[in-house]
Regions:
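Long C-terminal interaction/binding lobes of large macromolecular proteins
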Residues: 200
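RNA pseudouridine synthases
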Residues: 1-180
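Short beta-strand motif preference
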Residues: 130, 213-215
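Pseudouridine synthases involved in rRNA/tRNA modification
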Residues: 1-33, 190-191, 208-210, 218, ...
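Catalytic strand-loop-helix junctions within cyclic-nucleotide turnover domains
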Residues: 163, 206-208
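C-terminal amphipathic alpha-helical segment
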Residues: 181-192
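Short proline/glycine- and basic residue-enriched helix-capping loop/turn segments at helix->loop/beta transitions
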Residues: 193-197
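A generic structural motif
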Residues: 160, 203, 216, 266-268
């Protein structure tokens, strides 16, 4: 049995839709079966798929805890710095409305109640995420990520279309549309634009017109790698926001092929106790 409170202020929402939003990694059939059996109670009343919830409602879910309270996948921890592996599709934290019963942070809080995220990944992107259970370590890590100094991030991706050069550095500017939650690459400075730099290296061919690439975001802007590679003419497979939707349909079921695979703490990093350490997480076999 799992007790849950709907965040205050949430507008009336269909119960099944809310459950999927709050627990995005739980298979849909788990909720469908529970609602059919009336194993979900809203404010004490047995409820089904036709019911709604709103801010402040109390939910009681009679569902196996393995679906609702999974453990975090931990790559390294000394109970001060935590290096977790976030699965694709799992948000790092609750959304703007406070919805998020299953996030990377809630998983970490079961073992480290005071843990804080040092940086973020998009929900669709998987791989390494740093968190801290120690205030001093968190401040050091926050400084490193804020100043883009002291940590080197390496991503693995699958990119479409043949490359003219096996490696290179891309420079441009990024404009953010906060209302739409999207960004746009431009090639000259403009009001509100921030400079971006991305390094790429082609590694091997995964299929005709599809290449495994290593990416390094020298700057760390929202959606930088996805938007920059699409602007470069090599969108990432599975990216329906910035990429090639027609090409993506040739690989049904494939998620965004972007994975934070390695993180190196440099010798001059503010993370003084972890200088020289390197963390690696193998990318999935997408195709």
């Amino acid at each position: 049995m799992t007790a849950h409170r709907v965040p205050d202020g949430l507008a009336p929402t269909p119960l099944e839709k809310y459950l999927r939003r709050a627990w995005p990694m739980t298979p849909g059939h788990v909720f469908r079966d529970a609602l059919k059996k009336r194993d979900v109670r809203v404010n004490g009343a047995r409820s089904g798929a036709a019911d709604t919830v709103r801010g402040g409602d109390a939910l009681t879910l009679y569902i196996d805890a393995r679906w609702l309270e999974p453990e975090a996948d931990i790559l390294f921890s000394d109970d001060r710095l935590i290096v977790a592996i976030k699965p694709q599709g799992l948000p790092v934290d609750a959304d703007q409305s406070g919805v998020g019963a299953d996030t990377l942070l809630t998983r970490l809080h079961r073992r480290w109640p005071g843990a804080r995220l040092c940086h973020r990944l998009d929900a669709a992107t998987g791989g390494i995420v740093l968190a801290a259970a120690d205030d001093g370590v968190w401040e050091q890590a926050f400084q490193a990520f804020r100043d883009h100094k002291g940590v080197v991030k390496g991503y693995q991706a699958l990119a479409l279309r043949d490359f003219d050069r096996p490696e290179g550095t891309l420079d441009a500017y990024l404009l953010k549309d906060a209302r739409r939650g999207e960004v746009r690459v431009v090639h000259r400075d403009a009001p509100g634009a921030k400079p971006i730099r991305t390094r790429y290296r082609v590694q091997s061919q995964a299929a005709p017109g599809l290449w495994r690439v290593a990416l390094e975001p020298v700057t760390g802007r929202t959606h930088q790698l996805r938007a920059h590679m699409a602007d470069f003419g090599h969108p990432l497979l599975g990216d329906d926001r910035y990429g090639d939707r027609a090409a993506n349909r040739a690989y049904p079921g494939v998620k965004l092929c972007l994975w934070h695979a390695c993180l190196t703490v440099s010798e001059d990093s503010p993370l003084a106790d972890y200088r020289g350490m390197r963390f690696e997480a193998k990318a999935p076999e997408w195709v």
